[in-house]
Amino acid sequence: MWPLSHRHLCLAFLLVCVLSAISFFLHVHQDSFRHGLGLSLLCPDRRLVTHPVAIFCLPGTPMSPNTSSPCPQHPASLSGTWTIYPDGRFGNQMGQYATLLALAQLNARQAFILPAMHAALAPVFRITLPVLAPEVDSHTPWRELRLHDWMSEEYADLEDPFLKLSGFPCSWTFFHHLREQIRSEFTLHDHLREEAQSVLRRLRLGRPWDRPRTFVGVHVRRGDYLQVMPQRWKGVVGNSAYLREAMDWFRARHEAPVFVVTSNGMEWCRENIDTSKGDVMFAGDGQEASPWKDFALLTQCNHTIMTIGTFGFWAAYLAGGDTVYLANFTLPDSEFLKIFKPEAAFLPEWVGINADLSPLWTLAEP
């Protein structure tokens, strides 16, 4: 028997390595398809992207309850790539997210959000829409469509496979038929929900009698709206008279309610909201840079009083129960009414209380 040379030993070793690698690849390949490995390519056209981006979803793999899913829910039944430009503050981006989800489903398209929207919403909610990589966004042949703030027939028949929406949609007419899905998307992470409920428990224990409480979340929008509404839109924000009437509405219908006040103007609230009945609690921190604590608190209440703005809308929409809102808060000739339809903004069952427009008449006097 001839002794093996050093060269023969090297060749034999390489052959064993190659065969082992092939065997391993075949094993993984078979196992992956046996368990239904899903592949969703985010690239609309491989020729447009140097490095294709892919998301791998293992069906049945449990997700952490406090993280957002990176995978589409039904990638096989949807096509195309739709997204929306994230613009505005917290409530604006919630409206954009919900509208994108609803319109994409209506048109059988796959929805993706951009990283900025994910950064704004994912720390607060268990959102599930996948994130579109920046390099894919920059190479996609988008058609752009600016939405107005109510559902229109043409939005139900959009044939564009690659569509980037924009605007400030926040109307129930887009997504109310998916209310339970929207509520699921905007489920708070556990630590935020538990913190909010802890605040409400302390309010309950602070009462001199031991019985279940009815909590009414109150959101008072102030801040930049104090200038924007009268100067640009010929409108007003909610005043103390409105808040008193709204609270009396709940006092007449619910036994001993507790009003949980949040605002980006807490100092004004403490100075102007009547607390003589002992049922008003100033619980908000008013931090506009981190609004999720106030938002979580409002959603854990039973009912809502809102003034104006998308933040209050979403708090009321997610809380459920009764909602009282500020109605007719602009003059009839306001330009705001060209971009805002009250009947599309407020649910039909919500209760509107007319705003006091007398400060605007004073401003209009020569």
UniProtKB/Swiss-Prot annotation:
EC assignment: 2.4.1.69, 2.4.1.344
Enzymatic reactions: a beta-D-galactosyl-(1->4)-N-acetyl-beta-D-glucosaminyl derivative + GDP-beta-L-fucose = an alpha-L-Fuc-(1->2)-beta-D-Gal-(1->4)-beta-D-GlcNAc derivative + GDP + H(+); a ganglioside GA1 + GDP-beta-L-fucose = a ganglioside Fuc-GA1 + GDP + H(+); a beta-D-Gal-(1->3)-beta-D-GlcNAc-(1->3)-beta-D-Gal-(1->4)-beta-D-Glc-(1<->1')-Cer(d18:1(4E)) + GDP-beta-L-fucose = alpha-L-fucosyl-(1->2)- beta-D-galactosyl-(1->3)-N-acetyl-beta-D-glucosaminyl-(1->3)-beta-D-galactosyl-(1->4)-beta-D-glucosyl-(1<->1')-N-acylsphing-4-enine + GDP + H(+); a neolactoside nLc4Cer(d18:1(4E)) + GDP-beta-L-fucose = a neolactoside IV(2)-alpha-Fuc-nLc4Cer(d18:1(4E)) + GDP + H(+)
Pfam entry (one): Glyco_transf_11
Keywords: Glycoprotein, Glycosyltransferase, Golgi apparatus, Lipid metabolism, Membrane, Signal-anchor, Transferase, Transmembrane, Transmembrane helix
GO BP: any one term: carbohydrate metabolic process
Ranges per topology, Cytoplasmic: 1-8
Domain of life from the UniProt record: Eukaryota
Lumenal domain ranges by topology: 26-366
Pathway where this protein functions: Protein modification; protein glycosylation
Glycosylated position list: N66, N302, N328
One GO MF term attached to the UniProt entry: galactoside 2-alpha-L-fucosyltransferase activity
Membrane topology recorded in Swiss-Prot or TrEMBL: Single-pass type II membrane protein
InterPro entries: Glyco_trans_11
Spans traversing the lipid bilayer: 9-25
GO cellular component, one term: Golgi cisterna membrane
Compartment(s) where it occurs, according to its Swiss-Prot or TrEMBL record: Golgi apparatus, Golgi stack membrane
The family this protein is said to belong to: Belongs to the glycosyltransferase 11 family.
Described purpose of this protein according to its UniProt entry: Catalyzes the transfer of L-fucose, from a guanosine diphosphate-beta-L-fucose, to the terminal galactose residue of glycoconjugates through an alpha(1,2) linkage leading to H antigen synthesis that is an intermediate substrate in the synthesis of ABO blood group antigens. H antigen is essential for maturation of the glomerular layer of the main olfactory bulb, in cell migration and early cell-cell contacts during tumor associated angiogenesis. Preferentially fucosylates soluble lactose and to a lesser extent fucosylates glycolipids gangliosides GA1 and GM1a.
Record protein name field: Galactoside alpha-(1,2)-fucosyltransferase 1
Organism: Alouatta belzebul (Red-handed howler monkey)
